[in-house]
Amino acid sequence: MAKDQSMSRTASLCQEITVPKTIPVCIQDVFYRRVLEQHDAPAVCAWDGELTYGELDDKSSSLARILAQKGIHRGSFVPLCFDRSLWTAVAMLAVLKAGGVFCFLEPKYPLARLEHMCRHINAKMVLSGESRSELARKLGEHLAVNEDLLATSPSDQELVDVAPNQAAYVAFTSGSTGKPKGILVSHQALVAGILYNDKPMYLNRTSRVLSFASFAFDVSFLEHFWALLVGGCMCIPSESDRENNLLEAIENLQVNWAFLTPSVARVLNPTKLPSLRHLIMGGEPITQTDIDMWSPHVHLIGVYGPAECAGCTTIQSDYGKVESAANIGFPYAVTCWIVDENNHNVLVPTGSIGELVVQGPSLSEGYVNDPEQSAKSYITNPLWLSGSKEAEQQLYKTGDLVRRLSDGSLHFISRKDTQVKINGQRIELGEVEHHTRAVLGGNREVIVEAVKAGRPSSSLVAFIVTDNIPQSSTELFLAPDAGFKDRINTTKSLLRERLPDYMVPETYISINHLPSTVTGKADRKRLREQFTLLTRAQIKAYFGLEDKVKVMPLTEIELKMQRLWAKVLNLDLHEIARDDDWVSLGGDSLGAMQLASLARSEQFFLTVPEIFRHKTISMLCQNIKTDVSETIEEMKPFALLCDHELESDRILQTIADQCQVSQNSIEDAYPITSLQLDASIIPIQWGLNYTLRLEFKLPPTVDPAQLTLAWEMTVASNPVLRTRIVELTKDHYIQAVIRSKIPLENLDSSNMARYEPAVDVWGIGKPLVRVGLQANRFVMLIHHAIYDGQSLPLVFRDISNAYQGQKLALIHFAPFVRWSKSLDAPKRQFWIDKFAGFDGRVFPPVLDPSLDPVESRELTGHLNIVHDAFTATNKIRVTLAIVISWHHGTNDVVFGGVFARRSAPIPDIIDSAVPTTAMLPDRIKLDPDETLRYNLERDQDNILSLMLHEGIDDRDIEQLSPECEAVACKYGTLLAVQPDLATAYPEMFRERDMQYYGPICALNALMQCYLSPESATISLRLSESTMDGVYHWGRFLDEFEAVFHFIQKNPDVKLCYLRRQLDIPNPRSPA
């Protein structure tokens, strides 16, 4: 009887509920209303500029006319490939005004996935930012959006009328068939999804909305329109600030309204966000801990909804007043029905659990070019709507199980299928399974599940049925053998070529058989439960860490870092060793953001890329900036010249005469480093130019007066920019810091010649940097004596920070110079011991001394990097030593290395814009009777020892012993391994051209390796005096690549067998 009464009430409810009405208006029309109402109000506040509503309207219309001229019309699909920028908003509106349909492309996706997305929608053209134009070019016809392009807009080009029911955008999500599926959303659906929801979401003209969501997430569209359709302001941080400095970015942009997934919100400290008034959480389940953390500080709102429903489906408008975190609130733009999960023609009674079905004006149209999938998810005319005027409207089956509470709000239960969310990203497990089966081959059974296993957030686990299991085996989970681990390493690499990183399983479990339910289906629940029963030690076995000897953190810095790792990863301290891998312990990008944020509270300054690049506590602690390094005694000016044979008055007068300044203008003076000597004095012998010319195209919003002030502040705070080289006595040089300004010149015909390519700023006593500005072009000429590869981006960081109103710290170079010139007994003995017994043979030998060593040829190569127990630098060094040993006929190899020396015990040295680099000799003694792993491990120890004793110049090493003299400054090969610093420049200086006219190879052979996270580019330059038929350098480089890749796959092969394994003949035998 009770059930019949409940069913009766449900039927009555069905008659009473009304579906919200369609709002038949286009997105750009709603936006234009805001333009008329608040023409001069801020619409976009971004790292690269600001736009009012009027300016955004003008720019988007200009771009729309260009698109129309190029054939974009009603229904044309136009993907957008941008880094976070104000130009994103311009491009979105322009496509809509031209009648087109846009979609976002996440630039970090694998190229194959982006290509599929463009093919799937038959993309007419790709719009990109300038920084992504190269990627867009690979995807088809493209346009790079910038001010120069808008200047070509045809004023007479008519724009088409657009109907509200036309498609506006496509949101791509994971698809169970192995391919992403595109959700087609109309103008009127998006308008309804925004305007029906604005009040319960507290959106209005005062809202300053954060742009944070990945372009892979449908919320990225909504963030823009949440702001622009209600008259608010879109606040866009740079990608660097988004990843590494989110809390400060929110405050700097004065964000008061933000959508974040709970996983991201947990990274932030609510007490440090006074500007934030409304926090909207969604994308994944909200916990009571999230509510307790945030509701005392902000108005906490929860939203729920699949991408198929524009805006959001339900809103919990005040989480501070609900009893359960699972209460997802009420619908405003749609009507929610709850049906039997196995039969959508049957409504369930109030309070019963069923599948949520959505109906209303914010519903999407279906899936692009996928009628079969659309028919499964979208339905019309269910029995319980028969005879009603809404019966013919489309409804969407969400696949989510919910129940309706007595007040009409909804309580979320779970998914009914294999769709999951990881860090807010929607994933169809079937798509991951499809690709995993494909790369494994052999029709292997694979089940992928999202499992928490004691962590704050879920991760993907792949369960793989293993062939050829002995009949006696009864265990469901099998211990991973070496063969299984090798297959998984290959599988991961191949999956990353097909899927975004968040869709690649983190853990792979070998299973005896696929368990099934009584109905014959795969028993996913049992696999999840069995996995959660594994101990951490057992889980680590699947990362290949179970046999590793753990060395606990040693130093104070390492112990602090260990505590931070434990907090982020939810591990006990004893589980984290100094050389454990961040990823292998469960770290991901969100965890890295949290680690970077926590590290700041300990005065450690990390970035997300650094955490993944250095990946172990020991490596991180060698590369972080910290204020716990040893105290440096304050230095008085001229302290490093106290022992000079000349009296102080003579020194000052010599400096004043050569620099043509008064003695009062001399701030300090101290010895020059070997790098400075090599870059300034030595090249005079060959008439060489070591001046670097940089030209930057600045964002159009940059204010010249403000930039001039920022440059003056940078010069004042960086004495190295005011440094000049002085010849104190014959062949004895020092550097002097002069109290003088370096003007930012306005460039015109009268002074342009001073900034032409190939101009050399070098000169004894002369300034070594020159800067000019012409329109939005910033030009710098700077001599290598006052910068190195890592310090130069820091100069531009300081300019950018000063431009944004930040104070700059005064950075002195003298403490580092003192450290590099100190030669204590342990350091002296280290270098003497290092080269004891070396016979002094140089490789490659100079074959024709009459040839100029500066003239050179270049060969290039490529390495694919596998992340394992060894750093890329470690593997490159050992690889080079091996190949040199084959060509040189000895296992005792010496070559030069470029050392950044940023781990010096100087406060803030890692973040200081001073040239710390040195070229030092190095020696690797290979053991052919041991494995490659043994030789790599021995070199790891060698690297650590070098870092402890690198505070020395090569000319000082040369004086220590006859063996040292034989190698210091006389080695034939120089190796430079360095990260690709293209992204190290701040956003306003990203678009640049660099021209360098110095010698490319003053040594016999220079090998430069530029590292990115997954690969390395090799440049091998050889002086003309080295090139000869005896040495086949193309073959040398081929061997180098082959050895490097072999080492990664087979580290347990003995070195003496390596050449035979690779089928490489003896290079010293006749060809």
Swiss-Prot record:
Record GO cellular component, one term: cytoplasm
EC class of the enzyme, as a word: ligase
Pfam family of the protein (one): AMP-binding
UniProt pathway: Secondary metabolite biosynthesis; terpenoid biosynthesis
Biological process according to GO: amino acid activation for nonribosomal peptide biosynthetic process; secondary metabolite biosynthetic process; terpenoid biosynthetic process
InterPro entries, per the entry: AA_adenyl_dom, ACP-like_sf, AMP-bd_C_sf, AMP-binding_CS, AMP-dep_synth/lig_dom, ANL_N_sf, CAT-like_dom_sf, Condensatn
EC number: 6.2.1.-
Annotated Gene3D superfamilies: 3.30.300.30, ACP-like (1.10.1200.10), Chloramphenicol acetyltransferase-like domain (3.30.559.10), N-terminal domain of ligase-like (3.40.50.12780), Nonribosomal peptide synthetase, condensation domain (3.30.559.30)
Reaction equations catalysed: (2S)-5,5-dimethylpiperidine-2-carboxylate + 10-hydroxy-pre-flavunoidine + ATP = flavunoidine + AMP + diphosphate + H(+)
Sites bearing O-(pantetheine 4'-phosphoryl)serine, chain numbering: S589
Stored SUPFAM superfamilies: Acetyl-CoA synthetase-like (SSF56801), ACP-like (SSF47336), CoA-dependent acyltransferases (SSF52777)
Segments for region (Condensation): 689-961
Annotated spans, Adenylation: 33-417
Domain (Carrier): residue spans on this chain: 552-628
Recorded GO MF terms: ligase activity; phosphopantetheine binding
Keywords: Ligase, Phosphopantetheine, Phosphoprotein
PANTHER family: FATTY ACID SYNTHASE (PTHR45527:SF1), NONRIBOSOMAL PEPTIDE SYNTHETASE (PTHR45527)
Domain comment quoted from the record: NRP synthetases are composed of discrete domains (adenylation (A), thiolation (T) or peptidyl carrier protein (PCP) and condensation (C) domains) which when grouped together are referred to as a single module. Each module is responsible for the recognition (via the A domain) and incorporation of a single amino acid into the growing peptide product. FlvI has a monomodular A-T-C architecture.
Protein family according to the UniProt entry: Belongs to the NRP synthetase family.
Summary of the function given for this chain in its UniProt record: Nonribosomal peptide synthetase; part of the gene cluster that mediates the biosynthesis of flavunoidine, an alkaloidal terpenoid with a tetracyclic cage-like core connected to dimethylcadaverine via a C-N bond and acylated with 5,5-dimethyl-L-pipecolate. The tetracyclic core is synthesized by the terpene cyclase flvE and the cytochrome P450 monooxygenase flvD.
Name assigned to this protein: Nonribosomal peptide synthetase flvI
Originating species: Aspergillus flavus (strain ATCC 200026 / FGSC A1120 / IAM 13836 / NRRL 3357 / JCM 12722 / SRRC 167)
